A protein has these predicted regions:
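N-terminal glycine/serine-rich phosphate-binding loop of ATP-dependent small-molecule kinases
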Residues: 1-95, 137, 203-210, 375-382, ...
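Active-site core segments that coordinate phosphate-bearing ligands/cofactors
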Residues: 11-12, 21, 107-155, 165-180, ...
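Structural signal for short hydrophobic segments within the conserved structured cores
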Residues: 33-37, 189, 321, 420
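Short, acidic/turn-prone active-site loops that include or flank metal/cofactor-
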Residues: 37, 42, 99-106, 160-162, ...
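Gly-rich Lys/Arg/Thr-decorated short loops/hinges at beta-loop-alpha junctions or inter-strand turns
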Residues: 40-48, 155-161, 184-185, 324-330
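Short, conserved phosphate/pyrophosphate- and ester-handling motifs at nucleotide-, phospho-/glycolipid
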Residues: 52, 103, 214
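Short beta-strand-loop/turn "lid" adjacent to the catalytic site in phosphate-handling enzymes
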Residues: 70-101, 116-118, 143, 147-168, ...
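Short loop/turn motifs at secondary-structure junctions
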Residues: 72, 184-187, 354
């Protein structure tokens, strides 16, 4: 094979909950370089979740880009979690905490009744932030802070902006809605379509491109585009999407458009991902969950800071049921991963959609006990994506669009690759099923 021209490389940067990740990728989707810059997830109170936005949203992306050492990259694009918000000064530097999804300062009444991710959370973030820093130069979400740090352009994509409803009405910033929260249009970032050129990265010839929401970036390169394809995003947040032929509403779940024409996705986000599993890892003695006895596993309720889909209950809390003297640290750790798998299965069953295959993506795919628990809990093989940095990979594809190397977003599916397939284990099927039924009863699921 002829060597790939260095001119063909683009870069995707993902501002995540626990780290900024960056990948340099060629036209075939092969990763030539990667970087990960960790940052702290701050929990100043049980119902609060924030970043030091200077560290996580500004310094992290710039450092990650520098670590790749590819100043010749054709373009760079940023993906990020939503919603998020901070106030910035005239130099684009954050001056308030970086508020993150699920923080009580964005709490919206009746969120459980909404068929899409909660509308209004970002607006409540703005209300709090504007009161903390009235007259700030700007009120920006994470991608605007990162893009300004990279290229001096405070810009976000339309999908990110739409999550700010009612602040953004689909055509532009709503002056009246902003005024109600203490802000003006000129304090908000510019909004552009994803995959468009919007600037030049400092110190390079690279074009800055608009990226997109992290989950969207992961989805376009996952290959979960056919009816019954399930995408499980294993990050700090656990996200499950089932591809369906037509949109329909399911109580407790979200329905959103798919990037594939004529398709929709049903599912949602859960706190039973890395946020919960990381806490378990810190408080439970080290042991190998793969060595646990299938008959000696308790049941975790993984609601360490409330739950999103399908309950939308910020006041739920974690609990451990059925602990006895025959169990050990391996049993407790297996129970935690199993709880995450139970959440996946519950969302699949609530959706009522036929399941064809399960594809897992995200940093958690490196954790084999997690992948095994999802396979055991669902009773289905789990296809593990070859590139764990799925959001950064998708952003790199959008960067290609900005410089004319790609024209159709659905072509990103050619970058989908499976590293391994994790099969459910026969000796775990019956005991795991029994615990799943107990999990549903304890959680008050309407599947009982």
């Amino acid at each position: 094979m002829a060597p790939v021209s260095r001119e063909d490389v683009t870069i995707g940067i993902d501002v995540g909950t626990t780290a900024a990740k960056a990948v340099a990728v060629d036209e075939s989707g092969r990763v030539h370089a990667r970087a990960r810059i960790p940052h702290q997830l701050l929990v100043p109170a049980p119902d609060r979740l924030e970043h030091n936005a200077e560290e996580a949203w500004r310094e992290g992306p710039v450092t990650a880009l520098g670590r790749l050492n590819r100043p010749d990259a054709k373009a760079v694009a940023v993906s990020s979690m939503v919603p998020s918000l901070t106030a910035v000064d005239t130099e684009g530097r954050p001056i308030t905490p970086g508020l993150l999804y699920g923080d009580s300062r964005g709490r919206v009444p009746d969120a459980a009744e909404q068929p899409v991710p909660a509308v209004g959370e970002a607006a409540e973030f703005l209300r709090w932030t504007a009161a903390e820093a009235p007259g700030a130069a700007g009120y920006w979400p994470a991608p605007a802070v990162a893009n300004h740090a990279l290229a001096g352009e405070a810009v976000i994509d339309f999908a990110t902006a739409i999550t700010s409803l009612p602040l953004f009405d689909g055509t532009g910033w709503n002056a009246s809605a902003l005024a109600d929260r203490g802000a003006t249009v000129d304090q908000m970032p510019r909004v552009e379509t994803f995959g468009k050129p919007v600037g030049q990265v400092r110190g390079t010839s690279s074009v800055l491109a608009t990226g997109a929401i992290d989950a969207l970036c992961e989805q376009i390169v996952a290959g979960a585009d056919h009816d019954g394809d399930v995408l499980v995003l294993c990050g700090t947040t656990l996200i499950v999407w089932i591809t369906v032929a037509e949109a329909r509403q399911v109580p407790g779940l979200w329905t959103i458009p798919h990037t594939a024409v004529g398709k929709s996705q049903i599912g949602g986000a859960s706190n039973a991902g890395g946020l919960f599993l990381g806490w378990v890892d810190r408080v439970v003695a080290q042991a190998d969950p793969l060595g646990a006895d299938p008959r000696r596993v308790p049941v975790w309720m993984p609601y360490i800071r409330g739950e999103r889909t399908p309950f939308h209950d910020p006041d739920r809390r974690a609990a451990l049921h059925g602990v006895d003297l025959t169990q050990d640290a391996a049993s407790l750790r297996r129970a935690a991963y199993e709880a995450s798998g139970f959440v996946v299965r519950q969302i699949l069953e609530l959706s009522g959609a036929p399941v064809r295959r399960i594809i897992a993506s995200g940093g958690g795919t490196r954790v084999q006990p997690w992948m095994q628990a999802i396979a055991d809990a669902t009773g289905r093989p789990v296809e593990v994506s070859a590139v764990a940095e799925g959001a950064a990979l998708g952003a790199a594809f959008l960067a290609r669009m900005a410089v004319g190397l790609e024209s159709v977003i659905t072509d990103a599916a050619r970058w989908a690759a499976v590293e391994r397939v994790v099969e459910p284990r026969s000796e775990w099927v019956r005991p795991t099923n029994d615990r799943y039924r107990h999990f549903l009863e304890l959680s008050g699921s309407r599947l009982v």
